[in-house]
Amino acid sequence: MRTSNYLLSTLKETPNDAEVVSHQLMLRAGMIRKLASGLYTWLPTGLRVLRKVENIVRQEIDNAGAVETLMPVVQPFELWEETGRSEKMGPELLRFTDRHTRPFVLSPTAEEVITSLVRNEVSSYKQLPLNLYQIQTKFRDERRPRFGVMRAREFCMMDAYSFDIDKEGLEKSYQAMHDAYCKAFDRMGLEYRPVLADSGAIGGSGSQEFHVLAESGEDLIAFSTESDYAANIEKAEAAAPAGERAEPTQEMTLVDTPNAKTIAELVEQHGLAIEKTVKTLFVKASDEVDADIIALIVRGDHELNEVKAENLPQVASPLEMATEEEMRALIGAGAGSLGPVGLELPFIVDRSVAVMSDFGAGANIDDKHYFGINWGRDVELGQVEDLRNVVEGDPSPCGQGTLMLKRGIEVGHIFQLGNVYSEAMNCGVLGPDGKNVILEMGCYGIGVSRVVASAIEQNHDKYGIIWPDALAPFQVAIVPMNMHKSEEVKEAAEKLYAELTAMGIEVLFDDRKERPGVMFSDMELIGIPHTIVIGDRSMKEGNFEYKNRRSGEKTAVAMADIVEHVKAQLQ
């Protein structure tokens, strides 16, 4: 490709509204342009990378036995009513009506459509297992689109759906897709982790996310220093506290704490160790509890894990904290003075709190705390659950090593849905005994456009993008210096361009009438891995200059050897 025939829309300055590196560089490198909030046009350079990601994903998903389809972006609203997700999805699900006032939605995902298809097309267990996928545009009406294509409203996604006769078959399909994801991300040259995850709004039981590791990642992931255990912060657990609770050494005393509204203030003003304090949080209860409010108790230096809390049957979902007015109406005290002693509300205690002794907590009286509290003696322990976020250094639940925390960008997610959707939509087949069997489903997604941004977050320097070879828009750049003034340079550049393209190598030939500095800057900015510089001075010595984008190393290569040198670099 010649730049004279190409839309190379690079920018010198970083746009003000670009927050993260990938967004900045995608704009500067001429990969995308914003059309409206969360909506982007993919320019040629960006589209070439997007297609590279698509093709790798397609090849590995095909190799896993899946079959490609293509489903409409517009879906009938009635399908979403069948599964009950029409309301669960909330405002992210964009609804509209056609000219006949029939309700539709713009597809954020396709479980309903694919389940409807399979229930109409598949009737016998002999047609199973079946795994169908598509690479298609999706739309989620994000409240606050940001970070460019990382959190856009419209995005490109691979979504696959497996159908099996039983759970054993589902587990095989799930493992095959897990392995395909690993192969795809390995080929892309990304540093990533598959991690245990919560199933969220999709539903089902087991699920894993795939995270590209990057400091700018929105998600926090925990993994063992000694094993392959890994989970996102929502799902991560520490090993259960070991040992027995220590015997009491203090009497419970009521202490005036007028200026201690937070755990930090309590610790500072009264000399308590923070790990000897607890905080009590009032949240809305579910219908399973004979109360409007339930209390959750975690250690003072720990944070409540909202997803773990939401997953408790006693807690309303989505999680909603009680207001100050509701607290005072119940116990006559406000936040900062709450605790388990004398609390006439159901409460659940975190595992780390259950093994505490001689601890401090609010007294359910404004500006007062109890110190020296002990379970059994001063208050009954009751229900114990894992309620907290893990912290770095916690013992791994697998029993090997401790937990490390790193930031990651979620680029893929796989779910064992079970029969959540197939049962709701009566998707079954005749089994070997002639009876109807509801199918076991798996669903699998890769954010194709998000992978592009994630790769940049992991591969860049102050000059621009450093693409892994498998994702680069072009493999090789040819930069002829002052080509329009030197016939020798022009002839050598044209000859090399013809040779490399004839070999199937993707080459960007910079034939613009530009200063060499501009040409070099653009090639570095868009991240082409291998650059060949052709100039009069080096040619007089019989050489071209080869530059490796990742290492920055420059090498003089004999003109006669340049093609073989390039081939060697691409292997």
Swiss-Prot record:
Keywords: Aminoacyl-tRNA synthetase, ATP-binding, Cytoplasm, Ligase, Nucleotide-binding, Protein biosynthesis. It comes from the Bacteria. The keyword Metal-binding does not apply. One of its GO terms (molecular function) is proline-tRNA ligase activity. It is an enzyme of class 6 (ligase). Its EC number is 6.1.1.15. It is found in: Cytoplasm. One of its GO terms (biological process) is prolyl-tRNA aminoacylation. Signal peptide: none annotated. It catalyses: tRNA(Pro) + L-proline + ATP = L-prolyl-tRNA(Pro) + AMP + diphosphate. One of its GO terms (cellular component) is cytosol. InterPro entries: aa-tRNA-synt_IIb (IPR002314), aa-tRNA-synth_II (IPR006195), aa-tRNA-synth_II/BPL/LPL (IPR045864), Anticodon-bd (IPR004154), Anticodon-bd_dom_sf (IPR036621), Pro-tRNA-ligase_IIa (IPR002316), Pro-tRNA-synth_IIa_bac-type (IPR004500), Pro-tRNA-Synthase_IIa_type1 (IPR023717). Belongs to the class-II aminoacyl-tRNA synthetase family. ProS type 1 subfamily. Catalyzes the attachment of proline to tRNA(Pro) in a two-step reaction: proline is first activated by ATP to form Pro-AMP and then transferred to the acceptor end of tRNA(Pro). As ProRS can inadvertently accommodate and process non-cognate amino acids such as alanine and cysteine, to avoid such errors it has two additional distinct editing activities against alanine. One activity is designated as 'pretransfer' editing and involves the tRNA(Pro)-independent hydrolysis of activated Ala-AMP. Consists of three domains: the N-terminal catalytic domain, the editing domain and the C-terminal anticodon-binding domain. Homodimer. HAMAP family: Pro_tRNA_synth_type1. This is Proline--tRNA ligase. It comes from Vibrio campbellii (strain ATCC BAA-1116).
